[in-house]
Each structure stands twice: as structure tokens, then as C-alpha cells.
């Protein structure tokens, strides 16, 4: 294990390893740790889920997207690959780049990747498939499951600009989802976190037996993790939905 610095170890002292934290307490603890760590950049706060699924089975693959109420704290560049009347719809919705085969060729021939989200209409997907090797490893390949292959271009662009986050469980059953920057107000981080947890909970595979969300932690890019009280958080979400 890599040797931890003095600031990290001091931040670690702020976490009670035997305690399960509420979301509000976790955010507050991360803020206190940030004062100790004194990083020179605005760290991303993320939720990490340990799910009781085996992703090698297709029916246990957890994948989706969520529109964070308060975004991610950065302006995303959106590329729409489409044709015909949908070009104007994409431009009016605020897409940064819009095109068809010209955009596909630009990516293939110039290794152009100056965008954060790629949206495509279904009619373009046979041609977009050529980009799989380039976009796939970067998590940028359009996919109907997360709303980036769609006829409703306006909605997709609007959601991407607002801060729609895509997520996918990894092969070990872990799921990482960013919820904002440490500079965000506490309430904004809490509300973003609740939206993510509620969305992930709704994606529980129908045939899954046993516990779905085994544990959750919250951390910043380089901070220690804070364990969350999964049962209490899920109960409060159920009560709110009732």
C-alpha cells in the first residue's frame, strides 16, 4: 500500500470508522477533511456503491443515467450526430456540435474528441457503430439505455447540459457516480446524492435475490471514504415516495 501523507492521515482522523453516516453528516465530514487536505483544485465528490449483483449475467447489469438537480459544476460539450430536420432541433437545444457523417469522419480521421457527451438519432447508429473502438473505452458511445440514442434530441441535449450523468456497474460489482464539486453548498450535494441513490435503487434487477445495495461510501477525488447508513437512507426514500 502506498504511504499516506500527513494531511491525509490527519483527515482520516475526522472519520469514525465504526460509524454509518447520514448523507448530511458525510458531506459535512468531507468539507472538514477538505480544510485539512487543502487541495489546489476543486475536487469531485462521488458516491461509490457496492452492489450485490454479478455483472457477467446480462440480467444483473446495472446501467443508467440521472439528471442531477444541481449539475456537476462544469459546462459539458455536447455532440449530436444526426441528419435532416433533427439538425436544427439539436442546434436550437444548445448542442455544441451537430453533424452527420462529417462528424464521424472527423473523429476517425483527426482523432477529434473535444466533447463530453455524444447523442445520436437511431437512423445514424449503423454509421456511428464505426466509432465503437474510439468512443467505447471512453464511455462516450451513444446508448439507448442511458438516453443518448433517441429521436427526442431536444430532451437529450437539455438533460446533458443540465448535468445528466451516465453510470455502469463495473465487473466487480462497484458503481461510481460523481455528484458535484466539494465547493458546492452542502444542500446541493445532499440533493444530488439523494437523486443518484433513488435512481440506482429503482434499477434493481427484477430477479435479484438478497441485498441489492450492500454498502455505500462518499468521498472526494483524493480523500478518505465515509461510510453511509444504507438502510436508514433507503427507508427515508421509501417514506418520501409513499
UniProtKB/Swiss-Prot annotation:
One of its GO terms (biological process) is translation. CDD domains: Ribosomal_L1 (cd00403). Coiled coil: none annotated. One of its GO terms (cellular component) is large ribosomal subunit. One of its GO terms (molecular function) is structural constituent of ribosome. Keywords: Repressor, Ribonucleoprotein, Ribosomal protein, RNA-binding, rRNA-binding, Translation regulation, tRNA-binding. Pfam families: Ribosomal_L1. SUPFAM superfamilies: Ribosomal protein L1. Part of the 50S ribosomal subunit. NCBIfam families: rplA_bact. Binds directly to 23S rRNA. The L1 stalk is quite mobile in the ribosome, and is involved in E site tRNA release. Belongs to the universal ribosomal protein uL1 family. This is Large ribosomal subunit protein uL1.
Amino acid at each position: 500500500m502506498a504511504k499516506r501523507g500527513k494531511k491525509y492521515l490527519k483527515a482520516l482522523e475526522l472519520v469514525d470508522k465504526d460509524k454509518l453516516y447520514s448523507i448530511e453528516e458525510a458531506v459535512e465530514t468531507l468539507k472538514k477533511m477538505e480544510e485539512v487536505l487543502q487541495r489546489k483544485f476543486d475536487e469531485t465528490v462521488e458516491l461509490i456503491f457496492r452492489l450485490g449483483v454479478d455483472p457477467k449475467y446480462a440480467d444483473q447489469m446495472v446501467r443508467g443515467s440521472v439528471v442531477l438537480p444541481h449539475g456537476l459544476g462544469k459546462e459539458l460539450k455536447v455532440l449530436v450526430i444526426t441528419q435532416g430536420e433533427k439538425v436544427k432541433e439539436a442546434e436550437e437545444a444548445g448542442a455544441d456540435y451537430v453533424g452527420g457523417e462529417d462528424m464521424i469522419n472527423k473523429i476517425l480521421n483527426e482523432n477529434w474528441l473535444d466533447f463530453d457527451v455524444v447523442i445520436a438519432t437511431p437512423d445514424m447508429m449503423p454509421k456511428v457503430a464505426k466509432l465503437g473502438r474510439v468512443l467505447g473505452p471512453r464511455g462516450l458511445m451513444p446508448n439507448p439505455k442511458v438516453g443518448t440514442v433517441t429521436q427526442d434530441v431536444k430532451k437529450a441535449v437539455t438533460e446533458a447540459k443540465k448535468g445528466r450523468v451516465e453510470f455502469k456497474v463495473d465487473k466487480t460489482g462497484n458503481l461510481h457516480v460523481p455528484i458535484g464539486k466539494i465547493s458546492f453548498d452542502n444542500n446541493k450535494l445532499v440533493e444530488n446524492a439523494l437523486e443518484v441513490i433513488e435512481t440506482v435503487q429503482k434499477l434493481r434487477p427484477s430477479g435479484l435475490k438478497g441485498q441489492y445495495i450492500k454498502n455505500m461510501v462518499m468521498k472526494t477525488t483524493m480523500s478518505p471514504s465515509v461510510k453511509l447508513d444504507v438502510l436508514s437512507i433507503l427507508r427515508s426514500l421509501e417514506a418520501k415516495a409513499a
